[in-house]
Amino acid sequence: MAVLFRDQTKSALEALLFVASEPLTVQALARIVEIDVADALELLLELAKEYQDRPGGLKIVQVSDTWQICTRPECAPYIERLYRKSGTGLSKAAIETLAIIAYRQPITRSEVEMIRGVKVDSPINTLLERNLIEEKGRREGPGRPVLYGTTLEFLKHFGLKDVSELPPLEEFLVEGETIDI
C-alpha cells in the first residue's frame, strides 16, 4: 500500500470511528474504505497504537470483534460534569450482582441469590434496563430458568475486549480470605 494512500486510508478509518454512534467491525470498515480486511486490521492496530502513545482524551479500542473511538477513563469526571444526570450510578446491590454475573456467567437468578443471600429482582432489572446484562438462554431442567450474562455494552463500559480480560478475583480478596468458584 503506497504511503500517501495508506495515510489517507488511516485518516478515513479514524474519521469513520469518530462519527459512528456504534462500534464498527473490521469487515464493515474495510468495505467502506475499499481495502482488504487484513489491511484494515493492520491500519486499525497502527491507529490504536498511535492513540495509545500520545497524550490526549481519546483512545481507540477493540470491543469483541468491533472497533471504536472512546474517551480515556481519566477524563470521565469531566464528561460526567458535562452530562450530569442525577441518580445514574448503580447501587451496591446492582454492582455486586453485576460482578457475580460477570465472573460466573451464564448464571441463573436463583444462583445469584444463593451467592448474595438475598433476592436480586431489582438489581437484575436495573442491569437489564441499562443493557449491562442480557438473557443468554435457558438452563435445562425444572422450570428452565433464564441464564444471564454480560453484554457488549458491559465490555464497552469497562473497556474490555472480552470477559477473559476481567481482573482475577484474587486481586479483590483481603489477605487470608478465600473464595469458592
UniProtKB/Swiss-Prot annotation:
Keyword Ribonucleoprotein: no
Xref: InterPro entries: ScpB_csome_segregation, WH-like_DNA-bd_sf, WH_DNA-bd_sf
SUPFAM superfamilies linked: Winged helix' DNA-binding domain
Biological processes, Gene Ontology terms: cell division; chromosome separation; DNA replication
GO cellular component terms attached to this protein's record: cytoplasm
Pfam name, any one: SMC_ScpB
UniProt keyword list: Cell cycle, Cell division, Chromosome partition, Cytoplasm
Locations listed in the record: Cytoplasm
UniProt key word Transmembrane: no
Self-association state and partner proteins as the record states: Homodimer. Homodimerization may be required to stabilize the binding of ScpA to the Smc head domains. Component of a cohesin-like complex composed of ScpA, ScpB and the Smc homodimer, in which ScpA and ScpB bind to the head domain of Smc. The presence of the three proteins is required for the association of the complex with DNA.
NCBIfam families according to UniProt: SMC-Scp complex subunit ScpB
Role noted for this protein: Participates in chromosomal partition during cell division. May act via the formation of a condensin-like complex containing Smc and ScpA that pull DNA away from mid-cell into both cell halves.
Name this polypeptide is given: Segregation and condensation protein B
Organism this protein belongs to: Desulforamulus reducens (strain ATCC BAA-1160 / DSM 100696 / MI-1)
Gene that encodes it: scpB
